[in-house]
């Protein structure tokens, strides 16, 4: 038998999938993705520090006990079109917790406004 929490999550993802399938533009999908990921709060003990790295906006995300001497560089997914440091804070918190390291996530430029190789240049500069 599925728990109440699992049933709620399954229904939430079914609804999200149905909503996403009706979207036709990158802007619509970005708004939907921000709203969807905004449902998931980062724990209160997460440390989020906004920084600039090589001209690119970035965030350090750390779980309690993360070593200052260990770091993970994370390039978020999203097909170079969606996603940001904000949309990936929660997974980065859990990556920090599992690895014992701080996680640096870059907020690189996205297409179609910044076509290839703009996002790669920002990542390599960082």
Feature locations, PLM:
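Short beta-strands and strand-loop turn motifs
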Residues: 58, 75-76, 105-108
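Short, charged beta->alpha transition segments
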Residues: 59-62, 89-94
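Short beta-strand element of the alpha/beta-hydrolase
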Residues: 69-79
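Catalytic nucleophile-loop/oxyanion-hole region of alpha/beta-hydrolase
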Residues: 85, 91, 104-126
